[in-house]
């Protein structure tokens, strides 16, 4: 198995912790991303359903597409009213022109846009919304970016390197002549309050650490814990600056006749 594929499929090993400590999106980001008239939504690479459940509070019908059966099992158990199905963004098990919105939360970098974008266009109704969101630590803050250096010193050389990696990950690249218009971006800052123990558990749910050798993983998490404790309160609580980066576009209307393009 290639290294990229091993990392992409590693999250099921920590599915319960992933669901417990990974952040969900802030309401302001959802207000911006999800159109008010969205009645049927597809969540690609839905994981354990953190974004799925936020969608379900706004949308009548949500189809969660997730390839990892371990992640999907947690999603199904925690997400009443959601249809959870096996599948990938490059081959969606969803009928043509059946969704008002297709969303990808913190997973666009795992997709092949050349194959996924035509699939998304296929399942969207005319005028339907493609929304992409990443909710993560705000690496614009120096000490937050430095956490990446501490937990993975071989992969990240500086705080600016951590920020550059994140910018590349947040780049939504569409194939030539995609059937989308009204492209827009926005970001939303907020603060997440949690214990240091939970923050360390959160860092441990990232693929680079899941797939790292045990000794390297333990050392990286120990360094991160030490840095977090320096900023925590006496009872071990820390406020972590967060950012939701959002991207959206609307599907152009299909020609009056002929197959969807």
Set out the residue ranges of the language-model regions.
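Conserved class I S-adenosyl-L-methionine
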Residues: 1-45
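Residues at the starts of beta-strands that form the adenosine-phosphate
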Residues: 40, 61, 129
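Class I SAM-dependent methyltransferase SAM/SAH-binding core
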Residues: 48-91
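A short acidic, Gly/Pro-enriched loop at the edge of an enzyme's catalytic core
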Residues: 90-101
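Conserved catalytic/acceptor-binding region of the Class I
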Residues: 115, 121, 125-192
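Conserved Class I S-adenosyl-L-methionine
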Residues: 169-261
């Amino acid at each position: 198995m290639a290294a990229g594929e091993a990392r992409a499929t590693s999250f099921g090993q920590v599915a319960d912790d992933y669901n417990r400590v990974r952040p969900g999106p802030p309401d302001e980001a959802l207000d911006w991303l999800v159109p008010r008239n969205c009645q049927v939504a597809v969540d690609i690479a839905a994981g354990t359903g953190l974004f799925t459940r936020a969608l379900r509070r706004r949308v009548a019908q949500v189809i969660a597409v997730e390839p990892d059966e371990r992640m999907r099992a947690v999603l199904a158990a925690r997400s009443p009213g959601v249809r959870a199905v096996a599948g990938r963004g490059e081959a969606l098990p969803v009928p043509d022109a059946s969704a008002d919105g297709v969303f990808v939360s913190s997973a666009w970098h795992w997709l092949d846009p050349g194959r996924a974008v035509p699939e998304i266009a296929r399942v969207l109704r005319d005028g339907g919304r493609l929304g992409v969101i990443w909710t993560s630590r705000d690496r614009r803050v120096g000490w937050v970016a430095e956490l990446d250096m501490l937990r993975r010193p071989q992969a990240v050389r500086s705080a600016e390197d951590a920020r550059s990696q994140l910018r590349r990950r947040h780049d939504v690249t569409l194939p030539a002549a995609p059937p989308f218009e009204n492209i827009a971006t926005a970001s939303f800052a907020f603060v997440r309050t949690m214990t240091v123990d939970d923050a360390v558990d959160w860092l441990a749910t990232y693929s680079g650490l899941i797939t790292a050798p045990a000794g390297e993983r333990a050392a990286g998490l120990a360094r991160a814990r030490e840095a977090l404790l320096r900023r925590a309160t006496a009872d071990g609580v820390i406020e972590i600056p967060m950012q939701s980066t959002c991207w959206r576009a609307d599907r152009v209307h299909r020609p009056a006749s002929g197959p969807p393009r």
